[in-house]
From Swiss-Prot:
Lineage: Bacteria, Bacillati, Bacillota, Bacilli, Lactobacillales
Name the UniProt record assigns to this protein: Aspartate--tRNA ligase
Enzyme Commission no: 6.1.1.12
Region Aspartate, annotated ranges: 198-201
Assembly description: Homodimer.
Binding site for ATP: 220-222, 229, 477, 529-532
Molecular functions per Gene Ontology: aspartate-tRNA ligase activity; ATP binding; catalytic activity, acting on a protein; nucleic acid binding; transferase activity
Family membership: Belongs to the class-II aminoacyl-tRNA synthetase family. Type 1 subfamily.
GO biological process: aspartyl-tRNA aminoacylation
UniProt keyword Aminoacyl-tRNA synthetase present: yes
Name of the coding gene: aspS
Cellular component aspect of the GO annotation: cytoplasm
Length: 582
């Protein structure tokens, strides 16, 4: 029989009609001789009623065999329910079954197919096809489909060209580790799976495509966390002849369209802009969450000359004030915050509380001489908690930024209904890597430096600024972009500043440098993390919830057991040999 409609779409207007439905048995109940079935499909749940006085003995026998997750086909008459169920979209109607066929049986599932099920993440991933049956998960992927549909329509209307770029590319330095693919034909040589289509999309601008986009898979072999996966999807854009502001205008319009069409939210344009330095100094993060206050306060000048040497001799002293919540934090709680702070390089955490109008706590006695000035600068009031970090400016900012976010979550200070978009601009071109012992690109080595700072490529790299911009949403980096280098001489200077010899630069990026000899236009673009964007729109805290078949925190798939061993024959074909490190 042909399915008439989705079970979850049956409504009052269908009363009096005979329809055919197909789906899964969500639940079976026997009540007073009647059998009630909750039939589930991707659109929802519909109640079926099987009355032994109105169906054949064969139908009744089939109904008695039904168990959860059996796949069935039913035909019946739509009636009004005697008792409506306002928890279901189909709650005003039910289907009086006249015919029933079992299309497939099912074993007892390892967990219930319902929202809010308590089961380990690895079990969910091991049986991902069952996990995806849960209504909550289905809704996540309907949302994702709406987002990509909206993005494609918007960019198509602006005459962007959707171009696929290679999945087998050249391994290049900078950035995260590559996933490598050995070549059978060119033995000893390897492809890399792309971390982004960065260079190829720039070459498309050189080809005259003018406006490119792609919703593309990317790969990075890096440590995982809640908002990262080894393979992920990004909305990739590149344009020719546009300014930084023009590119941002396009992106803002795209996001506004997505928010309107998927969440029915009108976002205010243009988005606020904040410099990198302000973000770090006031929020302790280059991706600040602006849904709450608790800004970092610089006390370095205030405490200079103080008898408390931990403060007076530190390069920087900064603090955050937890307003009106000191009584929520016992000494044990603050000890936990101190251990948390040490993860970010802080040696410790000093603190005081405002109690009966006075500063109280382990360091209060050292602050007596500046108590009035301190209270005025921090605008202290009764029951405030002040947390201090005395260290380098970088450690103080990073530590207090992390504490700020943690405390806001602990105290439920964040309005989860808000979507605060923000541009972070005026980035440093380079960041110092302790691990590498050198400066590395803050974004990538193709970013255009500002005209005012480009001369420092041969001088103090810490002073070079980039024409780069990140878009931030609720404390997450949603995407990043920049204007790109299009002059060969500037690109060679950039490679040299990063420590490449001329031969190394030519070996790794010779094809790009050669392309710059053939009229490379000014260009720039941006990439947005699609998984992260959908995660935030869905109100989730892990991108696994919006990726159909994700990896776990060990970058493995419990369902398929990937990555897996391969045969000796396969290794021999590739001239590979695995060394044991036991």
């Amino acid at each position: 029989m042909k399915r008439s409609m989705y079970a979850g779409r049956v409504r009052e207007e269908h009363i009096g009609t005979t329809i055919t439905l197909k789906g899964w048995v969500s639940r079976r109940r026997d009540l007073g001789g009647l059998i009630f079935i909750d039939l589930r499909d991707r659109e929802g749940v519909m109640q079926l009623v099987i009355n032994p006085e109105e169906v054949s003995s064969d139908v009744m026998a089939t109904a008695e065999r039904l168990r959860s997750e059996y796949v069935i086909e039913v035909e019946g008459f739509v009636e009004a329910r005697q008792q409506a169920n306002d928890k279901l979209a189909t709650g005003m109607v039910e289907l009086k079954v006249s015919a029933l066929t079992i299309l497939n049986t099912a074993k007892t599932t390892p967990f219930e197919i319902k929202d809010d099920v308590e089961v380990s993440d690895d079990t969910r991933l091991r049986y991902r096809y069952l996990d995806l049956r849960r209504p909550e998960m289905l809704e996540n992927f309907k949302l994702r489909a709406k987002v990509t549909h909206s993005i494609r329509n918007y960019l198509d209307d602006l005459e962007f060209i959707d171009v696929e770029t290679p999945m087998l590319t050249k391994s290049t330095p900078e950035g995260a580790r590559d996933y490598l693919v050995p070549s059978r034909v060119s033995q000893g040589h390897f492809y890399a799976l792309p971390q982004s289509p960065q260079i190829t999309k720039q070459l498309l601008m050189n080809a005259g495509f003018d406006r490119y986009y792609q919703i593309v898979k990317c790969f990075r072999d890096e440590d995982l966390r809640g908002d990262r996966q080894p393979e992920f999807t990004q909305v990739d854009l590149e344009t020719s002849f546009l300014s930084e502001q023009e590119i941002q205008d396009i992106v803002e319009g795209m996001i506004a369209k997505v928010m309107k069409e998927t969440k029915e939210i009108d976002v205010t344009l243009p988005f606020p802009r904040m410099s990198y330095d302000v973000a770090m100094n006031s929020y302790g993060s280059d991706k600040p969450d602006t849904r709450f206050e608790m800004l970092l306060q610089d006390l370095t000048v205030t405490v200079k000359g103080n008898d408390f040497k931990v403060f007076s001799e530190a390069p920087a002293v900064k603090a955050i004030v937890v307003k009106g919540n000191a009584d929520r934090y016992s000494r044990k709680d603050i000890d936990k915050l101190t251990e948390f702070a040490k993860q970010f390089g802080a040696k410790g955490l000093a603190w005081v509380k405002v109690t009966d109008g006075q500063l109280a706590g382990p360091v209060a006695k050292f602050l007596t001489a500046i108590e009035t000035e301190l209270s005025s600068q921090l605008k202290l009031a009764e029951n405030d908690l002040v947390l201090f970090v005395a260290d380098t400016l970088e450690v103080a900012n990073n530590t207090l930024g992390a504490l700020r976010n943690r405390i806001a979550k602990d105290l439920d200070m964040i309005d989860q209904s808000q979507f605060n978009f923000l541009w972070v601009v005026d980035w440093p071109m380079f960041e110092w890597s302790e691990e590498e012992g050198r400066y590395m690109s803050a974004h990538h080595p193709f970013t255009l430096p500002t005209p005012e700072s480009a001369h420092e490529l041969e001088g103090d790299l810490a002073k070079v600024r980039a024409i780069a911009y990140d878009i931030v949403l609720n404390g997450y980096e949603l995407g990043g972009g920049s204007l790109r280098i299009n002059q060969k001489e500037m690109q060679e200077r950039m490679f040299k500043a990063l420590g490449f010899t001329a031969d190394e630069a030519n070996d790794q990026f010779g094809f790009l440098l050669e392309a710059m000899d053939y009229g490379f236009p000014p260009h720039g673009g941006l990439a947005i993390g699609l998984d992260r964007f959908v995660m935030l729109l869905a109100g989730k805290d892990n991108i696994r919830e919006v990726i159909a078949f994700p990896k776990n925190n060990k970058a493995s798939d419990p369902m398929t057991q990937a990555p897996s061993l391969v045969s000796e024959n396969q290794l021999e074909e590739l001239s590979l040999q695995i060394e044991s490190h036991d």
